[in-house]
């Protein structure tokens, strides 16, 4: 859905850019993406916690005599880096779905504003 408006369009032409069909699409988008977003957020939160657990498990087997040496060994370990990659992917997915939902909500708000403006304009005329 692209809402670019040419400068030479009248106000009434601009207000027809968002119609009932597109409102339905925005609502459908929310219905589709809300459960996906919830799942992505749950996955990201799980990986936040799992990252800490993985670090603790690796720390038990860490090489080094000081805490700093052990932490460095753990954070350089392939298993920990794998968890970090999974976490980054989860954050990316959650963020993408969040913005899809936000876009649909914004489209609905624009439509509502246009409808309110039309009602006010009809009262004036």
Question: Could you describe each region identified by the protein language model?
Answer:
Residues 1-2, 125:
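Acidic, gly/ser/pro-rich intrinsically disordered tails
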Residues 2-35:
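Short, charge-rich amphipathic alpha-helices with coiled-coil/heptad character
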Residues 9, 120-125:
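Short acidic DE-rich linear segments
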Residues 19, 33-35, 67-69, 83, ...:
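Generic alpha-helix initiation/capping and coil-helix boundary signal
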Residues 24-27, 113-121:
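Short A/G/S/P-biased low-complexity tracts
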Residues 37, 44-72:
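Extended alpha-helical coiled-coil "stalk/arm" regions
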Residues 41-44, 48, 52, 85-118:
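Long amphipathic alpha-helical coiled-coil segments
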Residues 64-93:
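Short, glycine/alanine-rich amphipathic alpha-helical segment
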């Amino acid at each position: 859905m692209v809402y670019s408006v040419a400068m030479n369009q009248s106000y009434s032409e601009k207000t027809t850019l968002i119609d009932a069909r597109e409102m339905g699409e925005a609502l459908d988008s929310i219905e589709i993406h809300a459960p996906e977003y919830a799942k992505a957020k749950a996955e990201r939160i799980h990986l936040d916690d799992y990252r800490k657990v993985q670090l603790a498990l690796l720390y038990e087997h860490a090489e080094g005599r000081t805490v700093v040496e052990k932490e460095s060994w753990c954070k350089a370990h392939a298993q920990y880096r794998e968890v970090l990659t999974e976490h980054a992917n989860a954050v990316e997915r959650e963020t993408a779905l969040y913005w899809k939902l936000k876009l649909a909500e914004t489209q609905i708000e624009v439509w509502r504003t246009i409808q309110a403006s039309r009602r006010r304009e009809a009262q004036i005329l």
